[in-house]
Structures are given as structure tokens and as C-alpha cells.
């Protein structure tokens, strides 16, 4: 009888290898070519992507990455590595590997490392608290493509999401309360989630429902009146309508409503990255202050916070 050996594959979106136009062009080409991310016909999308979007966006995005790049590398990779290391320390009997859907470390290498260690029960943990076809489902597709090359397949446990998990809500609550203790209670707490095109939700993606589930659970857990907690969506791209209300437009409008002090958390990001450190902490802060706001504090992602790592361990052990 074959003895079961579990192994964990942690997956996040990915990051360029360097804050340069060349590296970012390579990364964005892979990311934006995934039909789960952009479902426009390749006949229309490929020339637009390679002829217009990549040449124009890559230099601009490179400057943004340079503003947040850490000594150890890209923030997303740095924090994801710390998560992997902390999780492995809590589960020394179970191999834990990190793979990115796009860029490095890539999924084929991570899966190969696990299978080479004799893993027969592969637990896949996409680091997306709220399921979306453009993130979690893309992980499923990528893993399936890798495993097509193997004769002998492991059993698979795929953690779809954890939007309402009590340990996740507790970790978020503690993070918010630490910020309140340090900076005082704000006029508004803004919960900003990454957006997706409205059309994706209309076609069946339950991502906005899962974001609302997280928001409702966190509202109930916090010592702040529900009307002082706002849910928004950020990072829209392209011309079609995305989920609303938009974070940037909301922050620009709040000061005219008498809101002078806000704190902002991004519950859907398991690790800090360009979208939190530059788009939110820098750009959106400026939008709010320029519109007449007085105090803005960004509440960091859970990163390698002890409560976050404990949550991830619970998710994994429940699926072994």
C-alpha cells in the first residue's frame, strides 16, 4: 500500500525579475496573454498588446516598480518568500514550495521540486482570499498544464478561497485594530479590493460576492459603526466598465463629504506589492490629500504576520 506524502504549493500572481522596462515587458506579455485575465480574441488582442500596450506601459510601470523595489527584490516576491519560510517552519514535516502564475519562481519548477520529494498529495494554496476566474482559476489551469507532462499524478487538494475563514477575518481585525491604536480611529475605513471587469461577474465569476462576504464579516468584527466602513475596487485597466465604486474616485470625493481622516486596507492582497505600495499608499493617498483630506494611513497587507501564517497552516492541515 502506497503511503501518502503531502506537499504544499503556494501560488501568487507573479512579478518581474527586475524594475526595468525589458523585464516588465516580458512579465506583462506573459500575464496579459492569459485568456483568464484578458478574454479578448487573440486575433484582436495580440497586435494591440505587443504593438501598443507593452511598448507604452513597460517604461511607465518600470518607474513605478523602481519606487517600491526592495533590497531583496520585488515586494511581492520578498513577502511571499517570507510566508513560505514561516509556513515551512511551522510544518517541518511537510515540504512547502512557492510558485508564481507568471514570472519566477515558476510553477513547473515548484511542482517538479515537490514531486521529486515523493509528494503524493499535492495541496494547492492560491494566495487569493477571494476566488476569481482571473486569479484562482488561472492557477488551476496552469497546474493542469504542468501535470499533463507527468505519467504519475498526485492526488490534488485545491483550496478555492478563504474569504470568510474565521482566522482570516481575525488576522484582518487585529491588523486594523493595531492601526487604530497607533493612529486613532478614522472618519472612514476603506476596504479596497482589486477590481475585475463587470462583464466577468455577469458571466458567473462570484468574485464580487466573495469580496462582499469578507467585507460583511470584517464589518461585524470591528469596533466601528458599519456606516463608517466603505468597500471599493481598485486597479481598473482598459476601457470597459469594472466593478464599482472605484477606489480613486471614492477617495477624491470623501473630503467634500467632511471626511478628513481615513485608513485604508486591501483585504484581497495576501502580500504587499505594486498595487498596494505604489497605487494605494502613494497615488491614492495623494488623491485624498489633494482633494482636501488631512490624514491617510495605509494598513499593510498581512504578509508574514503570525496570525496570517497560522491561518495558512490551518487551511493546509484541513486539506491534507
UniProtKB/Swiss-Prot annotation:
Keywords: Cytoplasm, Heme biosynthesis, Iron, Lyase, Metal-binding, Porphyrin biosynthesis. It is an enzyme of class 4 (lyase). It comes from the Bacteria. GO terms for cellular component: cytoplasm. GO terms for biological process: heme biosynthetic process. It is found in: Cytoplasm. CDD domains: Ferrochelatase_C, Ferrochelatase_N. Pfam families: Ferrochelatase. It catalyses: heme b + 2 H(+) = protoporphyrin IX + Fe(2+). Belongs to the ferrochelatase family. Catalyzes the ferrous insertion into protoporphyrin IX. HAMAP family: Ferrochelatase (MF_00323). This is Ferrochelatase. It comes from Yersinia pestis. The lineage of its organism: Bacteria, Pseudomonadati, Pseudomonadota, Gammaproteobacteria, Enterobacterales. The gene is hemH.
Amino acid at each position: 500500500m502506497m503511503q501518502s506524502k503531502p506537499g504544499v504549493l503556494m501560488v501568487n500572481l507573479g512579478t518581474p525579475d527586475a524594475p526595468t522596462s525589458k523585464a516588465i515587458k516580458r512579465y506583462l506579455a506573459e500575464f496579459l496573454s492569459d485568456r483568464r485575465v484578458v478574454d479578448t480574441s487573440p486575433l484582436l488582442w495580440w497586435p494591440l498588446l505587443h504593438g501598443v500596450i507593452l511598448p507604452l506601459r513597460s517604461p511607465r510601470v518600470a518607474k513605478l516598480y523602481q519606487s517600491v523595489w526592495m533590497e531583496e527584490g520585488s515586494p511581492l516576491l520578498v513577502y511571499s518568500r517570507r510566508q513560505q519560510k514561516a509556513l515551512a517552519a511551522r510544518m517541518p514535516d511537510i515540504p512547502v514550495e512557492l510558485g508564481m502564475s507568471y514570472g519566477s519562481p515558476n510553477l513547473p519548477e515548484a511542482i517538479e521540486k515537490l514531486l521529486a520529494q515523493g509528494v503524493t498529495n499535492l495541496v494547492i494554496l492560491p494566495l487569493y482570499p477571494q476566488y476569481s476566474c482571473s486569479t484562482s482559476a488561472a492557477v488551476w489551469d496552469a497546474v493542469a498544464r504542468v501535470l499533463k507532462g507527468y505519467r504519475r499524478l498526485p492526488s490534488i487538494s485545491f483550496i478555492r478561497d478563504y474569504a470568510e475563514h474565521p482566522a482570516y477575518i481575525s488576522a484582518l481585525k487585529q491588523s486594523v485594530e493595531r492601526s487604530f491604536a497607533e493612529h486613532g480611529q478614522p472618519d472612514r475605513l476603506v476596504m479596497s479590493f482589486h477590481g475585475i471587469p463587470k462583464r466577468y461577474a455577469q458571466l458567473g465569476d462570484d468574485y464580487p460576492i466573495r469580496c462582499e462576504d469578507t467585507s460583511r464579516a470584517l464589518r461585524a468584527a470591528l469596533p466601528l459603526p458599519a456606516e463608517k466602513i466603505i468597500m471599493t475596487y481598485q486597479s481598473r485597466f482598459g476601457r470597459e466598465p469594472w466593478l464599482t465604486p472605484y477606489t480613486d474616485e471614492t477617495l477624491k470625493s470623501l473630503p467634500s463629504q467632511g471626511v478628513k481622516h481615513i485608513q485604508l486596507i486591501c483585504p484581497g492582497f495576501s502580500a504587499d506589492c505594486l498595487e498596494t505600495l505604489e497605487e494605494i499608499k502613494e497615488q491614492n493617498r495623494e488623491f485624498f490629500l489633494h482633494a482636501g483630506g488631512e490624514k491617510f494611513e495605509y494598513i499593510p497587507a498581512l504578509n508574514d504576520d503570525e496570525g496570517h501564517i497560522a491561518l495558512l497552516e490551518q487551511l493546509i492541515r484541513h486539506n491534507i
